[in-house]
Amino acid sequence: MIWEFALGDVEKCFGSDYSIYKGRSMQRNPNGELQLISRVYDLHGKRMEFDKTMTLVSEYDVPEDAWFFRNNSYPENMPYSVLMEVALQPCGFISTHSGAILTYPELDLYYRNLDGNGTLLRNPDLRGKTVLNEVKLLTTVASGNTIIQTHRFSLSCEGQIFFEGDTMFGYFTGESLAAQVGLDGGKKAVPWIDENASDSSILLDLNSVDFRKTIGE
């Protein structure tokens, strides 16, 4: 089912309501080694009933030798960026299942993460374990060809919650995204190192005796 949402036929995942998107661009789950949902096994809430909270429980079977552990200076820690994907991908699943995108069936809408807060309560070693995610779709507001939804998530492993938070996603038309200038106001921002002459840069060996003297060790 998750594979169909990522790369296959979304109708096979979400039902005949989504047959209208055959051959069209629509929201998809990340795939391949960045598909961080193994299964969805508990889903409550009726499609298009946005005045009621919809809930979902999903699981991710964390590979013991996943690429984000192998290529990590601290292989016992799941990188925060990956942890966020584990938390947020089921939010995308419940958003699609809710039918919000069907509010504007004639439009090709793009799904974007807008905001969020997360609290890391513990930092367990997740290698070879299963992470459970309890997600709530709290609100849905549609106006002017745009849809905004808010969620809460709670990640646990072996019965212990270790990461929880809230987030906001939105559906937008391509035209509205093209008109957004972003945090930089539309100005081109070049990397700091490109703005500074190389002859003014200093190479520091973090393991050298001189560097340790500089920082007072």
Predicted features and spans:
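Acyl-thioester-processing domains in fatty-acid/polyketide/NRPS systems
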Residues: 1-217
